[in-house]
Amino acid sequence: MKLKNETLSKNFLIYGFGKSGISSLKYLKKKNRCFIFDDDKKKIKNKYKKFFISKSKLLNNNFDYIVISPGININRCQLSNYLKKNQKKVITDFDIFYKFNPEVLTITITGTNGKSTTSKLLYDILKKHHYDTRLTGNIGNPILEEKRVTKNTIFVIEASSYQLAYSKYFKSKFSIIINISPDHLERHNTMKNYVLSKLKCVIRQNENDVAIITNSNLLKDLLRTKNIKSKIIYVSKNKYAYLKNKLSNDNFKNSTNFQNLNFLFELSKHMKLNLKTIIKTINKFKPLEFRQQVIYQSKYLKIINDSKSTSLSSTIPFLETN
């Protein structure tokens, strides 16, 4: 893939026109011929309809690249057979970002439970250290929507299994896998496929990169089958338990949220971050909306909104501490 060096117009099909699809179109359309397709044409706004291509026409069009949105399931969509025949052309907005910005420092956070909270907390920590930091991916803006990116910009990327599964070229300076439990198996079919999608952010790393990974036998077994070049650091659940007495924020009393802090403490050593600043930021951190959010509390009743949770395994530890 030579996207960065190509100045002549290329044909792009952007499949799926949610936030990531719109940002991909805006990013690519100046120097390339772009077409869009969505299973639900009605949701495409009038100002973008001039880019729409019908299914019958796109099937006879020779696209150079197919940019697919994470919400598209190749096995259950209108273009299923077409995508399977052209899998080598399928890329993501993550791939486009990396090819145009290979020098930008990226920190990718994935896993099953607590990705958003961990990503937002890291973003806050880096901002407190006065870094030009962007929060993107599955939280914040789509990655291609960020402007005025320089070599000093740091991207904190929350990556879901859906976003990583279709990526072909994206890699990250720091890749963090915070925990793994069964999730989205209706899409990935097997636990192995689900974990392999997460490992994509590690497999493409080089010798100068670092992967900070939960101490899981399944992850270790799968990594042994790959030619891993980066430095792998396995983090146990209580590696930094000695720092727990410095925390006053009740949101990190449950086991999952505290365990996920271990990965940020480990990362801080490699980035030479100030521990006092980290602790202060953690203690002032407010929970994200709809994530383990206490919306009512009395002597006899507590109502918790955890509607953003995608699995029961993320909710149970919070209930156990409340």
Per-region residue spans from a language model:
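Residues in the short beta-alpha loop(s) of Rossmann-like NAD(P)-binding domains
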Residues: G18, D40, I139, N215-N217
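Short beta-strand "acidic-cap" motif of Rossmann-like dinucleotide-binding folds
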Residues: C34-D39, R134-L135, V156, Y234
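Nucleotide phosphate-binding/pyrophosphate-handling subdomain across enzymes
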Residues: L3-N11, G21-Y27, D132, D250-N322
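N-terminal leader/targeting and accessory segments in enzymes
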Residues: M1-T92, I96, L273, T310-S313
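Residue-level detector of alpha-helix initiation sites
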Residues: K19, N113-T117, F258
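Beta-strand->loop->alpha-helix junctions that form or flank phosphate-binding loops
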Residues: D93-I96, N227-Y242, I279-N283, Q293
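Short amphipathic alpha-helical segments and their helix-coil junctions
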Residues: K239-N251
